[in-house]
């Protein structure tokens, strides 16, 4: 990890730059795959599965027999953990249900909103180096609460044509309707355009590598919406001299093991803590099963010493981290000053991994500085709010003249006339 001591504000932009994600260079490859999936459907998806995932498939859909077999293969202790996590995720997201209120803006004019679920959603669960069954819970649970009628899940199979049993178990528990053996760009294309097997959806959710990110960006231009721009995972720990260096190092490494392009940052007012964390990171790194991945990620990571907490907060809001852990003496007070972050973890006993799995909050969060404009996945991500209005004779007589004046000044005479004919019809 690179150490930076008392950086000038002019250095912040370069210092806080994320690892580059060059999706532009992938555009031709991604477009070719998407075009073939759009025109050839299942056949193209199956061919790309053989080329990219090295698996020969006869069909894409996961069968009931495979679901039953998977449930038997999940250890009891893992089932219990998944059930606990799903219960907490359900509780947190169910509390977000929208209750629209009718508002009378003036006598005779009543306006309100109604929350309606997106009917068809697609969830992408990456393969890669670890089975992300937790992401299944994070995406499918709020979709189920929202009332989405069709919840479609795509995830790449292994070379034997099987999906990790924990992914299938979590999907069934969280209410997924249909599961398909497809990964990468071809999976995004299948959900965006529809194939003989895979239904076309209206919105696609889920993380992925740079190819998946590029594919989601491309299909979002015309065909579907997506959850948010995605990039490599990241964490910032904001700490003072009271923080436990063992805890801080563990938190930094828990993010670093996600992938070689992940980023972990310590921002602290204590030089002593920075030195202790640097030592602890190296000590704990040697004990990790994924130490090679974490070690490469640490090359993108930084230990930053700042002069005071005001500077630390300003720097944090500029960085806008996906995950922010605050380990300071007055963490509640400092948390109130945070305006740009995906998810915030307060105090020494709130590790970021709690949010990744079982506290109940969602771990699908904005990265790459997008926390300045985006929030994480929530129940709102799976619904639309339709507005309604009802106007009586009293109401149109009150607001009608203002509408006529405004429409006339915008030179929209038909707009004006739509009100005028009603005012005259007494």
Question: Where do the language-model regions lie?
Answer:
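N-terminal Rossmann-like NAD(P)+-binding subdomain of aldehyde/semialdehyde dehydrogenases
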Residues: 1-119
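Short acidic-hydrophobic, aromatic-tinged amphipathic segments that line or gate anion-handling sites
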Residues: 2-7, 178-183, 303-308
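Flexible, glycine/charged-enriched surface loops at secondary-structure junctions
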Residues: 98-105, 225, 262-267, 287-297, ...
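C-terminal core of ALDH-fold dehydrogenases
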Residues: 318-426
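Conserved small-residue-rich beta-alpha loop and adjacent elements
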Residues: 103-169
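Conserved NAD(P)+-binding/catalytic subdomain of aldehyde/semialdehyde dehydrogenases
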Residues: 175-263
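A glycine- and small/hydrophobic-rich beta-loop-beta segment
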Residues: 258, 266-341
């Amino acid at each position: 990890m690179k150490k930076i001591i008392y950086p000038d504000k002019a250095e912040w932009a370069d210092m806080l730059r994320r690892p580059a994600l060059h999706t532009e260079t992938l555009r031709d490859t991604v477009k070719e795959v998407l075009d073939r999936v759009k025109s050839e459907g299942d056949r193209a998806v199956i061919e790309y599965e053989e080329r990219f995932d090295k698996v020969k498939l006869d069909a894409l859909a996961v069968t009931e027999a495979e679901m039953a077999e998977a449930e038997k293969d999940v250890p009891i202790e893992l089932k219990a953990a998944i059930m606990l996590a799903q219960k907490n995720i359900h509780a947190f997201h169910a509390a977000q249900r929208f209750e629209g209120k009718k508002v009378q803006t003036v006598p005779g004019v009543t306006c309100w909103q109604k929350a309606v679920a997106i009917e068809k959603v697609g969830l992408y669960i990456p393969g890669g180096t670890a089975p992300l069954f937790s992401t299944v819970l994070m995406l499918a649970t709020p979709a189920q609460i929202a009332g989405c009628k069709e919840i479609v899940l795509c995830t790449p199979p292994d070379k034997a044509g099987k999906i990790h049993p924990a992914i299938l178990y979590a999907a069934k528990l969280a209410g997924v309707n249909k599961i398909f053996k497809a990964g990468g760009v071809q999976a995004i294309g299948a959900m965006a355009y529809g194939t003989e097997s895979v239904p076309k959806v209206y919105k696609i959710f889920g993380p992925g590598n740079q190819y998946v990110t590029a594919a989601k960006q491309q299909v979002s231009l015309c065909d579907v919406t997506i959850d948010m721009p995605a990039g490599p995972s990241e964490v910032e720990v904001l700490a003072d001299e009271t923080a436990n260096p063992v805890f801080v190092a563990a938190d930094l490494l828990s993010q670093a093991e996600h992938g070689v392009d992940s980023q972990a940052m310590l921002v602290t007012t204590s030089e002593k803590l920075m030195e202790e964390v640097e030592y602890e990171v190296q000590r704990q790194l040697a004990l990790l099963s994924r130490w090679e991945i974490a070690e490469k990620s640490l090359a993108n990571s930084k230990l930053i010493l700042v002069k005071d907490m005001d500077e630390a907060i300003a720097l944090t809001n500029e960085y806008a981290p996906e995950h922010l852990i605050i380990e300071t003496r007055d963490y509640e007070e400092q948390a109130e000053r945070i305006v740009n972050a995906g998810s915030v973890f307060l105090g020494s006993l709130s590790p970021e991994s709690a949010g990744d799995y079982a506290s109940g909050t969602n771990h699908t969060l904005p990265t790459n500085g997008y926390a300045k404009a985006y929030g994480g996945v929530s129940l709102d991500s799976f619904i639309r709010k339709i507005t309604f209005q009802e106007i009586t004779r009293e109401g149109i007589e009150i607001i009608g003249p203002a509408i006529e004046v405004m429409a006339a000044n915008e030179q929209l005479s038909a707009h004006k006339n739509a009100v005028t004919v009603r005012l005259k019809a007494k």
